[in-house]
Swiss-Prot record:
UniProt cross-references to Gene3D superfamilies, sorted A to Z: GTP1/OBG domain, P-loop containing nucleotide triphosphate hydrolases
CC terms in the record's Gene Ontology section: cytoplasm
Enzyme class: hydrolase
GO molecular function: GTP binding; GTPase activity; magnesium ion binding
Binding site for GTP: 166-173, 191-195, 212-215, 279-282, 308-310
UniProt keyword annotations, A-Z: Cytoplasm, GTP-binding, Hydrolase, Magnesium, Metal-binding, Nucleotide-binding
Gene that produces this protein: obg
Lineage: Bacteria, Pseudomonadati, Pseudomonadota, Alphaproteobacteria, Hyphomicrobiales
Protein name, as recorded: GTPase Obg
Compartments where located: Cytoplasm
Length: 348
């Protein structure tokens, strides 16, 4: 299935049905009085988070969604039926924005989560509603209220615990394939990976989700290469695993390019914990290893892990470090949630 992580769609809720002007007409009843029913309510526009979806491809070919209009009221005090709702099904991790692409309406993070995006218009009152002691035969009824409309942006941000970042051809897909059951396309040329991929990693007794995003190049935040839009999928990650190609001529430059793009993107990515790895160690001699390791450690100012997705060198150590950080983040989030509940307290 083709991957699509952003869609722009137009939605409109249903109009309310009109009320009915009607009078009771029955044999031997001279003044039957008004019996016009009310109109039905228009359908709502609802967004629902469902399991089994990982793309917004359904919204590529259909971008207009309109809920049904409520049925008009009828004689004999018959109210019109409510209009059918429109339910937009989206994958977990979808964010809904206003047309300005900045105002967040909702963040769909749990299966089964539903929000009413637009309410349908109310149905109009029939003439039976307007009967009073001073007006026994009203000849008026209300039209139904208009539905609401708006254009929204759906943006999918994959929910992963850890994310792989690096230049094209840094070995990210090979690493993902080595540590999970995922089967990404692997080839010896840049931009083999064109869309993000997910894999479930199990280390010891712990499991977490690892995201592989397409490679970044210098100027990605300005649209170079595939751009930096895929960095949005890392915003929910607890930790970044930064892979630097050990066979590159200048490992320090490769490191600084990625860090520069992450900082230019912002959104808190630059503050996330990072495991820095010198990858493809199986292709280097002992002398080259030591030289590039020392250079990268000096330039980054942090500890560098030696790694090879092909031979498996250093893989388990990196996964354990990532799992430790993920579990630490989960514990902090749990503690914060518990604190929030205590502060709120019981209310009658």
């Amino acid at each position: 299935m083709k991957f699509l992580d952003q869609a722009k769609i137009y939605v409109r809720s249903g109009n309310g049905g009109a009320g009915c002007v009607s009078f009771r007409r029955e044999k031997f009843i001279e003044f039957g009085g008004p019996d016009g029913g009310d109109g039905g309510r228009g359908g709502d526009v609802i967004v629902e988070c469902v399991e089994g979806l990982n793309t917004l491809i359904d919204y590529r070919f259909q971008q207009h969604f309109r809920a049904k209009t409520g049925t008009h009221g009828m004689g004999k005090n018959r109210a019109g039926a409510n209009g059918a709702d429109v339910v937009l099904k989206v994958p977990v991790g979808t964010q809904i924005f206003e047309e300005d692409e900045e105002t967040l309406i909702a963040d769909m993070t749990e299966v089964g989560q539903r929000i009413v995006l637009l309410k349908g218009g109310n149905g109009g009152f029939g003439n039976a509603y307007f009967k009073s002691s001073t007006n026994q035969a009203p000849r008026r009824a209300n039209p139904g209220l208009e539905g609401q409309e708006k254009t929204i942006i759906l943006r999918l941000k994959l929910i992963a615990d850890a994310g792989l970042v690096g230049l094209p051809n840094a070995g990210k897909s090979t690493f993902l394939a080595a540590v999970s059951a995922a089967k990404p396309k692997i080839a010896d040329y840049p931009f083999t990976t064109l869309t993000p991929g997910l894999g479930v990693v199990t280390i010891d007794t712990r499991s977490f989700v690892l995201a592989d995003i397409p490679g970044l190049i210098e100027g990605a935040h300005e649209g170079a290469g595939l751009g930096d839009r895929f960095l949005g999928h890392l915003e929910r990650c607890s930790i970044l695993i930064h892979l630097v190609d050990g066979t590159a001529e200048d490992v320090a430059e490769a490191y600084h390019i990625i860090r520069g793009e992450i900082e230019a993107y912002g959104a808190g990515l630059e503050d996330k914990p990072e495991i820095l790895c010198l990858n493809k160690m199986d292709a280097l001699s002992e002398e080259e290893r030591e030289e590039k390791l020392a250079l990268l450690a000096e330039e980054s100012g942090s500890e560098v892990r030696l790694l090879s997705g092909v031979s498996g060198e250093g893989v388990k150590e990196v996964l354990r470090l990532a799992a430790d950080e993920i579990w630490k983040t989960r514990a902090m989030e749990k503690a914060e949630a518990a604190t929030g509940e205590e502060e709120e307290g019981w209310k009658p």
